[in-house]
Design a protein with these regions (language model features):
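Long, low-complexity N-terminal extensions
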Residues: 1-254
Length: 254
């Protein structure tokens, strides 16, 4: 039915009041969540040794470049054989850990004595992150999965786009340039054999020291998880005792 009355004076105009009130943006733009990481964690480090795996990460979650939350554990124990950690957006990591918890509860409820293994979790998270990336809705976090698979140490990496691999030494973020060369050099010197627990602990502590010294969003307080045949030993937070002479000679160690 035709409407009667005076025609509007202007037809194709932008209502300034709607722009200022946000009404126009709400009507014409889709609802969106943050597409960039906000509260983030820095590099994490993992290395195999003969009989187990060590994972290390500091306890800081940064808001941009501000050290906002200094006492946040970034090592998550899935069960007695598996631990995961991350660098990147911490909220996305919390979502992933809650997803893993629900999976674990469901498996325990429906299947008797079935324990989630690190390799199967690594494969599941690879497909999960790749699927989200394919939908252009990635999780802004890089995951490291460590544990014991059939009595053998397992260490795997998954990027935010679903790129995955397993290795004897794994780092994320700036740790790939700072500590990974040091780890690989020590593994090469061992001629293909895994390190002892003492050697792995030493290289892990050195990696955390270098991370704190050379990464502007790293933190001196860190935590190390040890996964072996006795289960998961989650270490208490410790503080880096940094010797700047060690950092000065960093290039000579590579």
């Amino acid at each position: 039915m035709a409407s009667f009355g005076p025609a509007p004076l202007f037809t194709n105009h932008v209502d300034l009041g709607s722009i200022l009130s946000g009404k126009l943006a709400t009507e014409k733009s889709p609802t969106a969540v943050s597409a960039y990481p906000i509260a983030t964690g820095s590099s994490v480090f993992g290395i195999k040794y003969d009989g187990g795996v060590l994972l290390g990460a500091d306890t800081l979650v940064s808001y941009g470049k501000m050290a906002r939350y200094p006492n946040v554990p970034r090592l998550f124990q899935v069960n007695d054989t598996t631990v995961i950690t991350c660098s990147g957006d911490y909220a996305d990591f919390q979502h992933i850990t809650s997803l893993v918890e629900r999976m674990q509860i469901e498996e325990e409820r429906t299947q008797n004595e079935v324990v989630m293994q690190p390799r199967s979790l690594h494969r599941y998270l690879t497909r999960y992150l790749y699927n989200l990336r394919s939908k252009f809705d990635p999780k802004w976090t890089n995951i490291v999965v460590a544990g014991l698979q059939d009595g053998e140490p397992f260490l795997g990496y998954i990027s935010m786009i679903g790129l995955a691999f397993t290795e004897d030494a794994v780092t994320t973020g700036l740790g790939g340039a700072i500590a990974l060369p040091l780890m690989r050099k020590m593994l090469d010197q061992n001629k293909g054999k895994l390190l002892t627990f003492e050697e792995a602990t030493k290289i892990m502590e050195e990696s955390l020291k270098l991370g704190f010294a050379l990464d502007c969003v790293a933190y001196p307080k860190y935590q190390i998880a040890n996964i072996n045949k006795d289960g998961v030993q989650m270490g208490k937070p410790e503080t880096v005792s940094l010797n700047w002479k060690y950092v000065k000679n960093f290039d000579a160690t590579l």
